[in-house]
């Protein structure tokens, strides 16, 4: 009788141990997040927001249509002048995308076909303002702790891993890799410009500025609320 009793207790223990009876966390991080090309991303919570903690690398819109790649300065300029989406690699070198992701003009990130995975979107200017507030505008806390020139590496205490991937001007030229990092918001400031953010190797501040929509910046995605 005692053997049967202890056997039943053991079985009950095993069954209970295999069940997760804790309350579900509605803000839990979905690992990994996968874009339409199969690239995987991790996320990090900063304040009440969830962010991808690496730059985007996708080459297709969410419906499967390819994002046009601008392989020459002329192609980049034409996309800018015509208000058409485009992406590129820094210096037209695919190797740079392995670390820094790809550079997109603003027309690509606001195209109605969508870039972000389902449940995610390109941040608005207001959401980037909130990110800055959440880290007290301390750029060092969102900078990666390696890769920045002039001894300007960050602490990365937020685990955002902001990297100095440089940018592409609307005129097709590339600048500032290893010295500056630039990210788009989805918010236009006027007909020609849109809001973005940059970090640099000369200080630890989150800078807000408006840029020509034809410029090529990195993008991060934020989770839908």
Please state what every model-predicted region is.
Residues 15-18:
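C-terminal motif of bacterial Sec signal peptides marking the signal peptidase cleavage site
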Residues 2-10:
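Sec-dependent signal peptide recognition
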Residues 23-225:
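Conserved positions within compact, well-structured domain cores
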């Amino acid at each position: 009788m005692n053997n049967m009793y202890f056997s039943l207790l053991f079985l009950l223990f095993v069954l209970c141990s295999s069940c997760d009876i804790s309350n579900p966390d509605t803000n839990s991080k979905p690992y990994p997040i996968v874009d339409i090309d199969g690239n995987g991303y991790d996320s990090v919570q900063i304040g009440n927001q969830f962010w991808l903690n690496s730059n985007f690398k996708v080459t297709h819109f969410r419906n499967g249509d390819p994002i046009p790649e601008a392989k020459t300065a002329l192609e980049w300029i034409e996309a800018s002048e015509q208000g058409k989406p485009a992406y590129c690699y820094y210096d037209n070198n695919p190797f740079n995308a392995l670390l820094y992701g790809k550079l997109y003009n603003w027309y690509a990130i606001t195209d109605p076909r969508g870039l972000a995975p389902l449940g995610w979107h390109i941040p608005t200017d207001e959401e980037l303002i909130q990110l800055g507030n959440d880290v007290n505008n301390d750029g060092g806390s969102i900078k990666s702790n390696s890769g920045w020139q002039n001894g300007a590496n960050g602490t990365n205490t937020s685990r955002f891993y902001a990297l100095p991937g440089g940018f592409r001007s609307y005129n097709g030229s590339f600048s500032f890799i290893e010295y500056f990092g630039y990210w788009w918001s989805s918010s236009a400031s006027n007909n020609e410009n849109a809001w973005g953010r940059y970090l640099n190797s000369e200080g630890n501040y989150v800078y807000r500025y408006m840029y020509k929509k034809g410029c090529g910046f990195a993008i991060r995605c934020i989770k839908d609320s």
